[in-house]
Structure formats: structure tokens, C-alpha cells
Swiss-Prot record:
Zinc finger (C2H2-type) stretch: 685-707, 714-737
Disordered: annotated span: 115-200, 228-340, 506-560, 653-677
Protein name as annotated: Longitudinals lacking protein, isoforms A/B/D/L
Subcellular location: Nucleus
Length: 787
């Protein structure tokens, strides 16, 4: 008997102790696992306490599998919520008489035990919403567990009633105005979570998925699906209240966003009726989860096909006023642009999203499929990859917002033509990106290879042809290590392209309109471009200077001037260097001046262009054998780089004893400018100062405003290079002030370069390029100029 005796251990203050422990945990915010929000303020709580004190919260929390859900109570004030929390945790609360009615009403809507009668019902239920940063919160969870919830609801009771009401609010979510102003990708993710997540999951195993790849149509479907939740939720609460006596369905969606209210009030009657019928059918067959899913899809499809035809009046902040389109067929037609426009007018999309919709729908790079909306009962499914297509669109939009100063002519040169890609796809600059140590000469050869396809698409940029731009940009400062003798490059070389070794007819006479600062007596070698025609390559043809004065020309040509290509200009440089090396090796004293220019050693047919003030070879001192070749003394000097192989329309014949340079000088001795007959054929607009011809008058005005007669305004911080364009300085620094050049590139360029021309002078020049390149490979070192 004694062994069977049992003792009863009683905790006298058990309940009060437990309640006090919960109160302490709440005050310390320990082990809290949910948050209640009202009027923008938050209160943390414990799920177990809320479930024990309210069957409404018990049902709500059973549907939530998030670790810490957030519930937003629309119709409850924060003071009332705080009082109800004190009541649930402590069992009592002190409140004034004027707040008693509101507190009891809120407590009855939340079914708090002791403050409400759960048997009679008829209260007002606020609409809790889950925050978007918890993966859709309650709404997505209710959609995902739809079949489980329906099976549980079949048992009936108070839990069934509140759960069914919660189900009736599933499609009524509308993102807040703040959330609708974020980027479109976030908008699409929220729309998937709040409006269409379980519909996609339930229908994937039963119905075929509609494929659509148009970005504009995808946004239209998202917008309209979210829009349809407004009238659908309103009719859902009405249908539920007419069939069952439920305590929580009178004002389900009392405080929605203003745009959703307007949409719900102005939607078509047919749309409302069809949505109401669909929801009624869903509540009559609550045990069948698939039927409910189909009904929700039905209201989505019908609201999309009819709701877009109605104009929304008011709330200009959410309606894109710039899109004044909204016909009866705007949403149902196969055109995705009209569908997206009607979705914009539905009042859900803000102006930022509307502009993205319009841009995406008009993008011709995406294929658009018709028949995106099927008949009643089918699924409205958005292809997930439509979201990733927007990344390219966003990048294009961002690229268009570049500052105009950053959009240099070099970038326009690479992106203008249809046959040319961007800088990454261009053959010229792809090589440059992969090997930054390339020689400038190799780059010029690659540029020349692309000039022909460029001429087929775009002939001029800012009034300049491709050859003119290449002549401006392609010749940087180069340093050649060679002999001790200073090498002065001829600064005013007239071209006489002869048909043969004894030809006397000049195909082109190119003279400069810029007067060189020399007197009439003699010409001295200066660092600036002011010297006389210097010693040239010796050949069998010696056409001596007619007057023997060697004065530089001062004429201005009114004819059409064609500029040198990079190969021709580089050939001149390499040829002069080779001759300089050969002369230094032979011990010949190189003297450049009037005496040698008039001695008959100069052959004008060897240099294929007039270089008036463009090139200067000067000795800068320092170690012996270091000679600096300043090709781009000024951009304006490069304007006078003129090709003598293409302008066949210029016909000026020179005598056997007079060079074209002196002939041009005699023509302009009286102070007038000689116009070469037949060069322009009456077309174009010549510059009265320098004689350059432009096809457009605006290009001529540009030239006169920024270039003609203007000194270079931009100075390279590392060398003496100056330019009239800021972009030229940038390109110069990028290419020239890098690591050393490689001689292999010079060899490749010398082997592949060939001058375009039909005379023997061009052939001789090409041969000299090969010889000069061979001499360079043997002992010449190219490196940047960092003076």
C-alpha cells in the first residue's frame, strides 16, 4: 500500500507564472517570431500566444511557414493594437471610455478571446498583408497550400469560417505605392509572389504553358493580372457573404491603394460579373482545389481582356498621361504594344514602368508571338526569361544617358555604320584591347583595312571623310633612335604624280592655304613647320626648281582636296628615316636648306602629298643619336595632308623645269587664291581660307568655327602634342603614353602595306617603305615620347 502511494505536486501560481514569463519575454523581445504592424508602427509577438488567444491568428499562423512573418493590420490603430497585446499577455488592460468601442470592434474582428463573441460573428475583419521581403508572406503561402487548406476547411467550424475568409482575400493584394515605384524587376517579382505564384504551380501539371517572349507583352500580362485582383477581390467578398454567414467578410478590402480603388470602380460591368460568377463557383466547390485555381485564372484572363478598354479617371500620379491610347481592342489584339498601352491606362503602372513597357514593346530585336491570352479557363503564364531580357534593355537605356562630351568622334566612328559593330566587335580595336603594346604603325594598317567597308555605309562624320579623320588621328609623336645628324622633314612638298619615269604631266597639284612664316630670301630649318623642300630620295628623274629660290608655297587651293591615308603618311616618314640612316652610314653630311633645294637633288614625284606645316623633324638635344619626329605638330597642319592619287579631275601641267610647288607659288604671288579647275565640279562648299571643300554647309560652318585658323587649345600633359579636339588628346595619351612599341608590328605593317595609286611614284614609295622597315628592324628602336 505504501508503495502505491503517489504524491501530487501542485504549482499554485502556475498560470500567472507562465503569463508573467511571456510578458517578460515580450518586453525583452526574446524568442519573438512574428510582427504585427499598424499605422506604420510595429509590435513583435509570439506565435503561440497569439494562437492561444485568437482562433483567427491560429488559422493565419498555421498557413504561414515563414520563420518571422509580418502582418499588416489595415483597420486597426496602433493604440488599439497595443492595448490588445497587453490584454493577451497580461489578461487585463486599462483603457478610456471613448476608446472602448473602437477597441472592442478591433478585438472582435481579430476574434480575441474574452473581448469578442466568436459564435455570433458579424464583425469587421482587417486585411493583413505580408511584407514583400518575406517571399510574399501570407499570400504566397496561402496559394501554395491551397489544396491542404481546402481539405482542412471541409471539416467546418469557426476555424473553417475564418480560413475561408482568408482564402477569399487571396487575390486582392495590391502593392503599395512605394513598392510600385521601384525598378521593374522588383515589380515583376512582387507581382509573381502576390498575384500569380500558386496559379503557376497548380496549373503546371494540368494545362499547357503559353509561350511568349515579348518583353512588352510580359509586362502587360503582369500588370493586368495584378489589376484584375482588385475587382475580383471585391466580388469575392460579396459572393462569400451571400452564401455563408461568416464573421469576417464585410470589409475585406477596405483600404487598398488609390489606383486599385479607381480600377475597381471603373472596371467594365461584364468584367465584374464574370469575375463574380467565377468566385461564386469557386466558393460553391471549395473541396476542389483545381476548380478554384481555374476560376482564379478565369478572372485573370477576363479582366485582362476587358478591363484594359476602360479609361481610368483620376490619380494622375499613377497614370501615364503621355500614353493617350485606349481603344476597345487595345488589350485583346495581337499587337503587344497596344496591350501594354492599355495596361498602362489601367492605373497600376507608374510613369517609370510605363516608359519601360513602351520601349520594350517597340523593340524590334525580340520576337513577338500572338495568341498570348487563351480562352476562358486557360492559364496566364509569364515566361520567366522575359525578366532577364530587360537587363539588355536597361543597359541600352543607360548607355544613351552618357554625357555628350564623353561621346567622342572616335566612338561615333566605331558605332555609326551598320556593317561595323561596337568597339568590342571591331577588328581594329579588338586587337588593341587584347594587346595594348601594339605598335601605332600596325594599328594604322588595320585602320586602313576597314576604310573600304566604312566608306560604303557612312562617308562623312562632322563634314570630314574617313581619310581626313584618319589623317587627323593616326599620326602621333614617335621617337626614333638613329644617327647623330638631325633630320628635318620637308614641310612643303608638292606632289607630281608622273605616269612614268619621264612623265611631265601632274595629276594633282596640292598646295596649302596656310602661309608659312618665311621670308622671300631663303628658308632655314626650324623646329616648326617652316622649312623649304628638303633633300629627297635620289632617282633617275631630277626636276630642278625652276626659280631656284626654294621658297615655300603660299597659295590656297579652292579645289576638292583629298587627304593622305595612313600608309602614305607613314611611308613618307619611314622613307625619310631610311634615307637618313643610309646617308649617315655613308658619312654624308646632311644639309637642309636653300642651296640643296635648288641644286636639282629634289624629286617632287617621290613624296605623294603636300605636307604644309604638318611634319617637323627636330633634334632636341640630349644623348647623341636621339631624334624626335613630331608628326602631329598641329591638327590644322594635318588638314593639308592631301592625296595626289585620287583627285584626277585636277588638271595642271607643269613645265619640265618648274615644280608644281613653284607653279602654285607663281599663281598666288599676286595675293589671290588660285582655284583648281574641275576639282569640285560645282558641288560642295569650299572654305574661303584654306580651300577645303565640304558637302554640307553646316560642316563648313563647323570647320570655320572650331578648326580653320584656330590654334590647338588642348595640350598633352606628357609631351608637346596639341590638338583642337579634346578627344584627340585622349586618344593620343591612350595610344602613345603606354608601354614600348614592338618592332614586330612594324615588320608586319611593312609587309602588308601598299599605297593606292596608279603612278610609278606610288610604287617607288611602297618599295621604300619595305626598305625602311628592314632598316628599322635591324637597329631602330621605337618608343613613346615622354618629353
Amino acid at each position: 500500500m505504501d508503495d502505491d502511494q503517489q504524491f501530487c505536486l501542485r504549482w499554485n501560481n502556475h498560470q500567472s507564472t507562465l503569463i508573467s514569463v511571456f510578458d517578460t519575454l515580450l518586453e525583452n523581445e526574446t524568442l519573438v517570431d512574428c510582427t504585427l504592424a499598424a499605422e506604420g508602427k510595429f509590435l513583435k509577438a509570439h506565435k503561440v500566444v497569439l494562437s492561444a488567444c485568437s482562433p483567427y491568428f491560429a488559422t493565419l499562423l498555421q498557413e504561414q511557414y515563414d520563420k518571422h512573418p509580418i502582418f499588416i493590420l489595415k483597420d486597426v490603430k496602433y493604440q488599439e493594437l497595443r492595448a490588445m497585446m497587453d490584454y493577451m499577455y497580461r489578461g487585463e488592460v486599462n483603457i478610456s471610455q471613448d476608446q472602448l468601442a473602437a477597441l472592442l470592434k478591433a478585438a472582435e474582428s481579430l476574434q480575441i478571446k474574452g473581448l469578442s463573441d466568436n459564435r455570433t460573428g458579424g464583425g469587421v475583419a482587417p486585411k493583413p498583408e505580408s511584407s514583400g521581403h518575406h517571399r510574399g508572406g501570407k499570400l504566397s503561402g496561402a496559394y501554395t497550400l491551397e489544396q491542404t487548406k481546402r481539405a482542412r476547411l471541409a471539416t467546418g467550424g469557426a476555424m473553417d469560417t475564418s480560413g475561408d475568409v482568408s482564402g477569399s482575400r487571396e487575390g486582392s493584394s495590391s502593392p503599395s505605392r512605394r513598392r510600385r515605384k521601384v525598378r521593374r524587376r522588383s515589380m515583376e517579382n512582387d507581382a509573381h509572389d502576390n498575384s500569380n505564384s500558386s496559379v503557376l504551380q497548380a496549373a503546371a501539371s494540368n494545362q499547357s504553358i503559353l509561350q511568349q517572349t515579348g518583353a512588352g507583352l510580359a509586362v502587360s500580362a503582369l500588370v493586368t493580372t495584378q489589376l484584375s485582383s482588385g475587382p475580383a477581390a471585391g466580388t469575392s467578398s460579396q459572393a462569400s457573404s451571400t452564401q455563408q454567414q461568416q464573421p469576417l467578410t464585410s470589409t475585406n478590402v477596405t483600404k487598398k491603394t488609390e489606383s486599385a480603388k479607381l480600377t475597381s470602380s471603373t472596371a467594365a460591368p461584364a468584367s465584374g460579373a464574370s469575375a463574380s460568377a467565377a468566385v461564386q463557383q469557386a466558393h460553391l466547390h471549395q473541396q476542389q482545389a483545381q476548380t478554384t485555381s481555374d476560376a482564379i485564372n478565369t478572372e485573370n484572363v477576363q479582366a485582362q481582356s476587358q478591363g484594359g478598354a476602360q479609361g481610368v479617371q483620376g490619380d494622375d500620379e499613377d497614370i501615364d498621361e503621355g500614353s493617350a491610347v485606349g481603344g476597345p481592342n487595345s488589350a485583346t489584339g495581337p499587337n503587344p504594344a497596344s496591350a501594354s498601352a492599355s495596361a498602362v491606362h489601367a492605373g497600376v503602372v507608374v510613369k517609370q514602368l510605363a516608359s519601360v513597357v513602351d520601349k520594350s514593346s517597340s523593340n524590334h530585336k525580340h520576337k513577338i508571338k500572338d495568341n498570348s491570352v487563351s480562352s476562358v479557363g486557360s492559364e496566364m503564364v509569364i515566361e520567366p526569361k522575359a525578366e532577364y531580357d530587360d537587363d539588355a534593355h536597361d543597359e541600352n537605356v543607360e548607355d544613351l544617358t552618357l554625357d555628350e562630351e564623353d561621346m567622342t568622334m572616335e566612338e561615333l566612328d566605331q558605332t555609326a555604320g551598320t556593317s561595323q559593330g561596337g568597339e568590342g566587335s571591331s577588328q581594329t580595336y579588338a586587337t588593341w584591347q587584347h594587346d595594348r603594346s601594339q605598335d601605332e604603325l600596325g594599328l594604322m594598317a588595320q585602320d586602313a583595312q576597314q576604310r573600304d567597308p566604312q566608306d560604303l555605309s557612312i562617308t562623312r562624320i562632322a563634314g570630314l571623310t574617313w581619310n581626313e579623320w584618319n589623317a587627323r588621328l593616326a599620326m602621333p609623336l614617335v621617337t626614333l633612335r638613329e644617327g647623330v645628324q638631325p633630320l628635318v622633314f620637308p614641310t612643303d612638298l608638292s606632289v607630281d604624280k608622273q605616269q612614268g619615269a619621264a612623265g611631265l604631266t601632274a595629276k594633282d597639284v596640292n598646295v596649302s592655304g596656310r602661309k608659312t612664316p618665311t621670308d622671300g630670301g631663303g628658308c632655314k630649318s626650324e623646329p616648326r613647320a617652316a622649312s623649304t623642300p628638303a633633300r629627297t630620295h635620289s632617282s633617275s628623274n631630277h626636276s630642278s626648281n625652276g626659280n631656284g629660290s626654294g621658297k615655300p608655297t603660299k597659295t590656297s587651293s579652292g579645289g576638292k582636296l583629298n587627304h593622305l591615308t595612313e600608309e602614305e603618311a607613314t611611308a613618307l616618314m619611314l622613307k625619310a628615316v631610311a634615307e637618313k640612316q643610309a646617308a649617315a652610314a655613308a658619312g654624308t653630311e646632311l644639309s637642309f636648306g636653300e642651296d640643296q633645294a635648288s641644286s636639282g637633288n629634289g624629286n617632287s614625284s617621290d613624296y605623294p602629298a603636300t605636307l604644309s606645316g604638318a611634319v617637323t623633324f627636330a633634334d632636341v638635344g640630349g644623348p647623341a643619336g636621339l631624334c624626335h619626329i613630331n608628326i602631329l605638330n598641329s591638327i590644322s597642319a594635318m588638314n593639308n595632308l592631301i592625296s595626289g592619287s585620287t583627285a584626277a579631275g585636277v588638271g595642271i601641267t607643269t613645265g619640265s623645269g618648274q615644280s608644281p610647288s613653284n607653279s602654285g607659288h607663281n599663281n598666288s604671288a599676286g595675293g589671290g587664291s588660285s582655284v583648281l579647275g574641275g576639282a569640285d565640279n560645282g558641288a560642295g562648299h569650299p572654305c574661303p581660307v584654306c580651300g577645303r571643300v565640304y558637302k554640307l554647309k553646316s560642316s563648313l560652318r563647323n570647320h570655320q568655327k572650331w578648326e580653320c585658323g584656330k590654334e590647338p587649345q588642348f595640350q598633352c600633359p606628357f609631351c608637346v602634342y596639341r590638338a583642337k579636339q579634346k578627344m584627340h588628346i585622349g586618344r593620343h595619351m591612350e595610344r602613345m603614353h603606354k608601354e614600348k612599341f614592338k618592332l614586330e608590328d612594324v615588320k608586319n605593317f611593312a609587309g602588308s602595306s601598299g599605297l593606292d595609286g596608279d603612278s610609278s611614284g606610288a610604287t617607288a614609295t611602297a618599295a621604300s617603305v619595305v626598305a625602311a622597315a628592314a632598316a628599322l628592324v635591324s637597329g631602330v628602336e621605337l618608343h613613346p615620347h615622354f618629353s
